[in-house]
Amino acid sequence: MAENGRSLFFSGDYYDCARVHARDPIEGIRANLAVLDCDYGMQPGSASRDAQVDALIAAISEALADGRPVILPVPRYGRGLGILTYICERLPETDIFADRHFITELGHMDATAMWVRPQVQDMLSGKFIRAIPEDFVALGVYFVCDPQLDDIKTRRLVRRLLICGGRVIFTGTVEPNTHASLLLHAGKAQLLRYSVHCTQADMLRIAAQNHFDQIIAYNSDFAPTKKVYEV
């Protein structure tokens, strides 16, 4: 965006390893001011995407091999579909269960096909997703669109699966003073990050591939920074 001889670039939510949706690379762009995704901020020890996926799939595979169902609390949009593609690719025989929000999002992929990578569209269109059973626990992976476990129905499901030896894996930010954080701090859940945003290191790497006079690192409400980097 340019006005009065000055230009602004806004990345929006951006991660250059996006799995499901097509994206344009942020390279070779000139702007006086750039607002770049830095939602994960100065997170320490952030592994590469490949390492993150390997760790997550290994944890899921190990739990299933032990007869333990896995529940993945994810946001309503984005991250869950990406994780599902890796399960389909690496653990193709796994039964998948999901709440209505996740199933609805999956159903919308046909309507948004122009934004979805063709290979992902083909992979997910052939995957049968079951509704979460209410009267028994089956072995498989459960997607629930409730990342902080705010819904009482989600918490009841988690309790039911934990009683049966299930494993809860969070893959994104666990916000403080939530039911998710209580479960994590009690040692009844695990955090294995699956990145969908940039860390500060990612943001600076992307900035180095462009020509921005000034950068504002855009963060979430839980890690607010207004620091401006001069480059």
Predicted regions and their residues:
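Conserved phosphate-coordination/catalytic loops
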Residues: 47-54, 78, 148-149, 193-201
